[in-house]
């Protein structure tokens, strides 16, 4: 069996229909071999940790034909293809039945209406939408296809045309898996709290549109420009489609640049839940990339315009004008300062002249007083009393000498005074003695 898988991987350029039966048979046996060991309990949606944390790139790219052959959605389809009982005897589908199931699953309107528009499956839709918050695209895709197969088998069983090859093991497996999904969905948040529009609207046929119509709508391309068309037509992006009408290329050319920026911002604010739900389930049946919408090109144009808006060429022309204005204002200030400087020297000269005049007057007065003092000093010196042409130095020298001589004479006179006073005292005493003797 592994030889068939490797053959399918190497010869990916061959016809898809020739490789598909071998691939499903191989994965079917491997899955049920593991399922028998786990007592017919299918793995929980969050059991495979590596698939849970295998994140898609942002924005998600369309898978190639080679990756589509080994996508986990095919594994899930193969894993939930009905077989017989646990003994594995004679209850498996043929390759033609499996191909018919896959074609009805991916492209049939009956499957889309029974799965998406059925009000009983609302919990499953909520579960897929809310749990797909970590861009776990592969596990969400496998879960989606498995749930579609389970609901399709239940619909065929209720319709009275059950497959004769399906046994009790397949029914118990699908019922247990649906119970697990319903229990997980009860723990999730209701999308009606987040999205204003109802999930299932029977009056409007827009939520039940076929994958072809949703794949080529301009609003879906604007929300997911690089993701492939998914078979699940979820109501959330269609609710956004009703909010934001599709913009054609002619309308986008007539819009202004600021309106384009506002439109892009509004789409980005509304789209994260829908983008996550859509990118989490890449389709296994469509291998061609959808055509790029004009809104995506408009987004690129807005990004380049934002980059140009940071440094537009019009401001480059404004810089020299601002510089010229600054230069002109600087010149005017320089002229005003020069005029002030030209006027200030005149006033300063007059002020300086006045100061000089006052200074000269004061200096003359000081000199005159000094001369008068010298003349008075000269008159006090006996040697220079009549010498009018005596210089100042001679006057000062003679004055000092005269002062010293006067001080010496003064000292002599003081000593004489003291002697005379003593003499007087003595004379007084004698006088008194004489008076006493006479009496």
Swiss-Prot record:
UniProt biased composition (Acidic residues): 251-263
Its predominant location is: nucleus
How does the record describe the protein's post-translational processing? Phosphorylated by PRKDC. Phosphorylation at Ser-329 by PIM2 leads to the stabilization of MYC. Phosphorylation at Ser-62 by CDK2 prevents Ras-induced senescence. Phosphorylated at Ser-62 by DYRK2; this primes the protein for subsequent phosphorylation by GSK3B at Thr-58. Phosphorylation at Thr-58 and Ser-62 by GSK3 is required for ubiquitination and degradation by the proteasome. Dephosphorylation at multiple sites by the PNUTS-PP1 complex promotes MYC stability by preventing ubiquitination by the SCF(FBXW7) complex. Ubiquitinated by the SCF(FBXW7) complex when phosphorylated at Thr-58 and Ser-62, leading to its degradation by the proteasome. Ubiquitination is counteracted by USP28 in the nucleoplasm and USP36 in the nucleolus, both interacting with of FBXW7, leading to its deubiquitination and preventing degradation. Also polyubiquitinated by the DCX(TRPC4AP) complex. Ubiquitinated by UBR5 when not forming a heterodimer with another bHLH protein, leading to its degradation: UBR5 recognizes and binds a degron that is only available upon heterodimer dissociation.
Locus of motif UBR5-degron: 355-364
Q: Where is this motif: 9aaTAD?
A: 100-108
Compositionally skewed regions (Low complexity) per UniProt: 209-238, 279-288
Residue(s) carrying Phosphoserine: 6, 62, 71, 81, 151, 161, 293, 314, 329, 344, 347-348
Crosslinked positions (Glycyl lysine isopeptide (Lys-Gly) (interchain with G-Cter in SUMO2))? 52, 143, 148, 298
Q: Where in the cell is it found?
A: Nucleus, Nucleoplasm; Nucleus, Nucleolus; Nucleus; Cytoplasm
Choose any GO biological process term that the UniProt entry carries and state it: positive regulation of miRNA transcription
From the UniProt entry, list the residue stretches annotated as the region Disordered: 201-359
Q: Where is the bHLH domain?
A: 354-406
Q: Sorted alphabetically, which SMART domains does this protein's record hold?
A: HLH (SM00353)
Annotated region Leucine-zipper: where? 413-434
A GO cellular component annotated for this chain's UniProt record is: chromatin
> What is the protein's known function?
Transcription factor that binds DNA in a non-specific manner, yet also specifically recognizes the core sequence 5'-CAC[GA]TG-3'. Activates the transcription of growth-related genes. Binds to the VEGFA promoter, promoting VEGFA production and subsequent sprouting angiogenesis. Regulator of somatic reprogramming, controls self-renewal of embryonic stem cells. Functions with TAF6L to activate target gene expression through RNA polymerase II pause release.
What quaternary structure, including any partners, is listed in this protein's UniProt entry?
Efficient DNA binding requires dimerization with another bHLH protein. Binds DNA as a heterodimer with MAX. Interacts with TAF1C and SPAG9. Interacts with PARP10. Interacts with KDM5A and KDM5B. Interacts (when phosphorylated at Thr-58 and Ser-62) with FBXW7. Interacts with PIM2. Interacts with RIOX1. The heterodimer MYC:MAX interacts with ABI1; the interaction may enhance MYC:MAX transcriptional activity. Interacts with TRIM6. Interacts with NPM1; the binary complex is recruited to the promoter of MYC target genes and enhances their transcription.
Query: How are the domains described in the entry?
Result: The 9aaTAD motif is a transactivation domain present in a large number of yeast and animal transcription factors.
Name the record gives this protein:
Myc proto-oncogene protein
Native species: Bos taurus
The UniProt gene name for this protein comes to MYC
């Amino acid at each position: 069996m592994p030889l068939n898988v490797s053959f399918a991987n190497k010869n990916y350029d061959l016809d898809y229909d020739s490789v598909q039966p071998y691939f499903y048979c191989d994965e079917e046996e491997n899955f049920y071999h593991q399922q028998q060991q786990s007592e017919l309990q299918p793995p929980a949606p969050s059991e495979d940790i590596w698939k849970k944390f295998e994140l898609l790139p942002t924005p998600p790219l369309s898978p190639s034909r080679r990756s589509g052959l080994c996508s986990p959605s095919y594994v899930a389809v193969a894993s939930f293809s009905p077989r017989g009982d646990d003994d594995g005897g004679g209850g498996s589908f043929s390759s033609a039945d499996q191909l018919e199931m896959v074609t009805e699953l991916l492209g049939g309107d009956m499957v889309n209406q029974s799965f998406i528009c059925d009000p009983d499956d609302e919990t499953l839709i909520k579960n897929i939408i809310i749990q797909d918050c970590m861009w776990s695209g592969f596990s969400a895709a496998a879960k989606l296809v498995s749930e579609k197969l389970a609901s399709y088998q239940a619909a065929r069983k209720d319709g009275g045309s059950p497959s004769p090859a399906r046994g009790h093991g397949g029914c118990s497996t699908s019922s247990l898996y649906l119970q697990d999904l319903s229990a997980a969905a009860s723990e999730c948040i209701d999308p009606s709290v987040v999205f204003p529009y109802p999930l299932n609207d029977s009056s409007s046929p827009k939520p039940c549109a076929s994958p072809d119509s949703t794949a080529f709508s301009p609003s879906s391309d604007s929300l997911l420009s690089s993701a492939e068309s998914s078979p699940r037509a979820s109501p959330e992006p269609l609710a956004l489609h009703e909010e934001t009408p599709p913009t054609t290329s002619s309308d986008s050319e007539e819009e202004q640049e600021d309106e384009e920026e506002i439109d892009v911002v509004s789409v980005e604010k509304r789209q994260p839940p829908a983008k996550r739900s859509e990118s989490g389930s890449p389709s296994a049946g469509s291998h061609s990339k959808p055509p790029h919408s004009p809104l995506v090109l408009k987004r690129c144009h807005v990004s380049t315009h934002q980059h140009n808006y940071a440094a537009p060429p019009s401001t480059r022309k404004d810089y020299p004008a601002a510089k010229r204005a600054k230069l002109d204002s600087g010149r005017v200030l320089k002229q005003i300062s020069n005029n002030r400087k030209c006027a200030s020297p005149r006033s300063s000269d007059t002020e300086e002249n006045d100061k000089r005049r006052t200074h000269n007057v004061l200096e003359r007065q000081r000199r005159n007083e000094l001369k008068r003092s010298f003349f008075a000093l000269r008159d006090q010196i006996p040697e220079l009393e009549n010498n009018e042409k005596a210089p100042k130095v001679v006057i000062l020298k003679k004055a000092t000498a005269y002062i010293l001589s006067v001080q010496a004479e003064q000292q002599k006179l003081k000593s004489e005074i003291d002697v005379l006073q003593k003499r007087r005292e003595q004379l007084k005493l004698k006088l008194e003695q004489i008076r006493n003797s006479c009496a």
